[in-house]
Amino acid sequence: MAQIIKFVEDRRVLMACTILSIIMIMAFRELTQYLGAPMFDTLQGGYDMTTVRDFMLIYGDAGRQDYAYATLTLDGAFPLIYGTLSIGLLLKLAAFRFLRVLAILPLFLMGLDLYENVQLFSLLMQFPDLTVEAVARASTTTQIKGMAVMAVLAALVFQLLLRIILAAYRQFNVG
């Protein structure tokens, strides 16, 4: 476990994950442009059967196939990359040892994201034979994932602000 923690805290790993995350975000933006409609996992408010059917028709057969492929490849790797980055930053920023437990949040998010990818792949491959239940489950997962993203971002901001406050306090009391 200590080796894994050392790995994710390494500056080179953090830099590589940052660069890869940026590249992947740009690729997702291009994919969205190509598809002609938003990707389902970006709809943080969720979606319903009507939205799914409308978007699937906009994507077209080729778009659905490409989206499904990207869901298994690009979007399959993305949670591992941003998860490693988030875990590394949370561990590195932890002002107190007990705050390192916040690094569990990205693990939960990564699992949710991968589960969501499986659900979306299934919807893409089963179209037009979709069920309201399958769409509702995928939508709920997307909404929960959105909340998990906010929790991870809040933990990162909290850790960073705490570091800044402690550094200012030390500077004020030393100087």
Residue ranges and their predicted role:
Residues 106-112:
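Alpha-helical transmembrane segments of multi-pass membrane proteins
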Residues 70-91:
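Hydrophobic alpha-helical transmembrane segments
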Residues 7-8, 91-100, 168-169:
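Membrane-interface helix-boundary motifs at transmembrane edges
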Residues 32, 87-94, 158-166:
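Membrane-water interface at transmembrane helix exits
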Residues 112-165:
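Alpha-helical transmembrane segments of multi-pass integral membrane proteins
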Residues 11-14, 98-105:
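Membrane-interfacial loop-to-transmembrane alpha-helix junctions, especially the N-terminal start
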Residues 2-3, 165-175:
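Short, charged juxtamembrane terminal tails flanking transmembrane helices
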Residues 2-69, 128:
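Interfacial loop at the N-terminal end of multi-pass membrane proteins
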